[in-house]
Amino acid sequence: EISLGLVGSEMCIRDREGISYLVAADLPAVIIDVMRIGTGLGDIAQGQGDYWQMTRGGGHGDYRTIVLAPASVQENCDMMTTAFDLAEKYRHPVLVASDAAIGQMVEGVELKDFVDHDIDQYDWAIRGCKAGQAPRKVQNVYYTNPQYPEFLRSKYQAIEDNEQRWESYHAEDADVVLVAYGISSRISKEAVNMARAEGFKLGLIRPITLWPYPVKAFETCKNAKAFMTVEINILGQMVDDVKLAVENKYPVGFYGTFFGLPEPEEIVAQAKAMLEKEGK
C-alpha cells in the first residue's frame, strides 16, 4: 500500500501508467493531486482543470478510480484516513483531488486520535519472507481469467452503490441548484446565503466523491428548475456528470473562472440570468 502526492501536470507525466498497473494488479494506493491552473507547464495558481483526468481513469484500459474532493484544510487531513480505508476495502487506487487554493491555505486543523491498524490482517499484503509462510505473489495479469470482467464490473457496481458522498445545502426547495466541489463549493455556499437573503431560492450540492458521482444527491431537488456548475476551469468539466445525474431533464449551465476565484455576487447573477433565460 502506497501514497503519493503530486500537483497538476506531474499527474499525467509521472503517474497514469502506474495507476493503470495498480488496478490491473488489484492493489490499494492513495494518490493526491493538488489541482492547479493551465495546460502544459501551467501555473501554481488556483485551478480545477484536472476533473476529467481524475474521474475518467486517465491511463490505458478499462478502469475508474475512487476520487475524494476535500473542501478545507481539515478535510485534506481527514480524507487521507478515508482514502486509505477505501483503498484497502476495495483493493483499489483512491485519488484525493484537492486544489491549489486549499493547498496554499492556512487553517486550523484538529488531528484525530490514532486508531490501531492491523497491518497483517490481509492475506494479499506482502510482508517479507517469514519462515513457514506461504508465498505471496503480486501479479497484474488477472485479466486473463475468464471471470475477471464480471469481477471488475461487480467491484465498480459495489463502489457506486455504497460510496456516493455529498453535502446538500438548501437544495431541496431551490429554484436553481449550484453544483461545486473543493474551494468552489465554499464560495458557492456564500453565494447561496447571499441569494437567500435577497429572497432568491438558490441551493448547493457539493460532491464529496467525484467518482462515484453522487447521483443520489439530485433526487432530493424536487423544486429545481435548473442546475449550474461552478468550477475554476474553462470548459465546465463537471457539466456532463450533472447532466447524467439529472437524466437531461433540466437545463445544466456552467459558470467558470480561469485566473482567479469565482465571486459570490457573480455566481448569484449568473444563476438569476440562467433562470431568466430558461423562462422559469
Outline where the language-model segments fall.
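Single conserved hydrophobic/aromatic residue that forms the stacking wall/gate
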Residues: 1-8, 12-13
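Conformationally flexible catalytic loops at phosphate/diphosphate-handling active centers
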Residues: 91-168
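N-terminal alpha/beta PP-like core and its mobile active-site loop of ThDP/TPP-dependent enzymes
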Residues: 15-70, 119
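Short acidic, glycine/serine/threonine-rich loops at helix termini
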Residues: 15-20, 40-47, 78-81, 105-112, ...
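Redox- and metal-dependent alpha/beta enzyme cores, enriched for Fe-S-associated oxidoreductases
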Residues: 165-201, 205, 211-217
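Conserved thiamine diphosphate
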Residues: 45-100, 279
